[in-house]
Amino acid sequence: MKKRFISILLCLSLVLTFVIAASAVTKDTAPTGADYGLAKTCADGNILQCFNWKLSDIKAELPNIAKAGFTSVQTSPLQRHDGNSTWYWLYQPTGFSIGNEIGSLNDLKSLCTEADKYGVKIIVDVVANHLAGGNNGSWAGSIESEMRQSAYFHNQGACSDYNNRYDLIYKNIGMPDLNTENSFVISKVKSYVQQLKSAGVDGIRWDAAKHIGLPSEGCNFFPSVIDANMYNYGEVLEAPAGNSAAAVNNKLVKEYTDYIGITDEPYSGTITGAIRDKKIVKTKGNWTTIGVGADRLVYWGESHDTFSNGDGWTKNLTQNQIDRSYAILASRANSQALYLSRPSSSNYSSIWTGNKGSTHYTSNEVAAVNRFHNAMIGKAEATGTANNCFVICREGGAVIVSPASQNIDVTVNNISGLVPEGTYTDEVSGGKFTVTSTKITGHIGSTGIAVIDPMKFTPAPTTAPTVAPTAAPTAAPTAAPTVAPTVSPSASVMIGDSDLDGDITIVDATRIQRSLAELTVLSSKASIAADADRDGGITILDATAIQRRLAGLDTVAWIGTFINYP
């Protein structure tokens, strides 16, 4: 009786959800992060830096940002300042209150609410090392009244030795250095972080993090202000103690990453420099070589400093050169990569706050790399160089970048045999790549970037073994010949095909619903196929996704594509 009742409920549920899905064809539907294949957390995805953008402009671009595969958006600082609208005034705040040309608190709340609909996370740049004023320590006239106490600043004069750790954390780097050991300063910053969190912010980027001390140096700032439920990473340019001994810098980096992620500028700069010089470098990382996990590191092809500062060097590189560097860095396992939306001007004094930057982030090559990154979460990695190309092999696909050429035929190593044998489509150019157990061969298009898409994969054909027939006894009747059935190669499975019949039908949705009601048991292979939205579990949403596909909505890109099995 119980099973009969459950069966009736399943039938009603199936009919109802299918009718709803079909009727929705004529209505606008709100996509989710799963529809775009975005990572579930900031730490697993890549970041679009909307440098100087108004929050309202970011909000309007959210559909394109999600479609381009960016899990997170990083805004410029939202703290008040008293300067003009040149970009660098955003990094000279007067205190810890929200509201400047970028947007208001209400604008931030509106952005975060809308971003949630797309599965996009919001990261806000926070300036907590210093406030506005002079390099001699004088305060700007508009410093918030409650911050106008000498005890809240270090008052040690200007930094003159950038290889001296004491100077770096206690002296002014152009503006009065906050006393980040002071309990009131800590409480103000912590309160500001919580205000951002309450508005819906998911993460914090800590400006000038290397100029803020650590517990081993008598400063409990980071353990006190960070919210463990938010994403946190800090700007550490070059090394924490400049050109000091490697042992000193290594110790500091490891301590920073006990609390926050950090930028790996040395590795990022090496890769971008190699693209600039049209050469191969064999480095696989910088801070990872001392044991720091890649999940604690942020890479970039360029940053707002390398582009917008007076001595910024990447402003002299083309967007395509930056894209090639980004493709290498953003396809790496576990780490996050930041992509700068370049401002319209490269002149330090002509970059205006609130001006929307380049939308090149929507380009096919950038989006393809992001989708690859998201599809490869949790997958193994092997990197190397061959045939004057950088090669990043992942467990199911690869990214190949030429630093010097385009429109070339290449053969590179299938490093560690991670990429399954078969034929793949390059998601950038649409060309084909053939993969054997040892080699990857194909044509890199005009961008110099190829993304061997794990979701556009035809497995190499397999040949069934030939078994010699066993002679039947004379007295026995002659057996009819047995013909082996034609099956899909065991090395792949079609997403959505929960009954493993090679097609997507309403039966697949029904089978998922029956498994949820414990009326049937899915095999391990069928379970992989049943996870239609690829969120790591089987729920009623998977059945609904298939029904929507059959109704013509097709918002879940994975359905009908192949992935490797096992």
Label the predicted regions:
Residues 4-23:
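Sec-dependent N-terminal signal peptides of Gram-positive bacterial secreted proteins and lipoproteins
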Residues 38-45, 79-113, 143-179:
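Aromatic- and acidic-residue-enriched carbohydrate-binding clefts of CAZyme catalytic domains
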Residues 443-464, 491, 559-566:
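A recurrent domain-boundary module in secreted/ectodomain proteins
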Residues 20-23, 465-566:
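Cellulosome-associated attachment modules in secreted, modular CAZymes
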Residues 46-56, 175-187:
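Active-site mouth loops of central-metabolism enzymes
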Residues 135-153, 219-235:
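A short alpha/beta connector and helix-capping loop motif
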Residues 70-78, 111-132, 139-158:
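Glycine-rich, aromatic-flanked loop segments that form ligand/cofactor-binding clefts
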Residues 25-46, 59-66, 77, 84-91, ...:
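Active-site-proximal helices and loops of the catalytic beta/alpha 8
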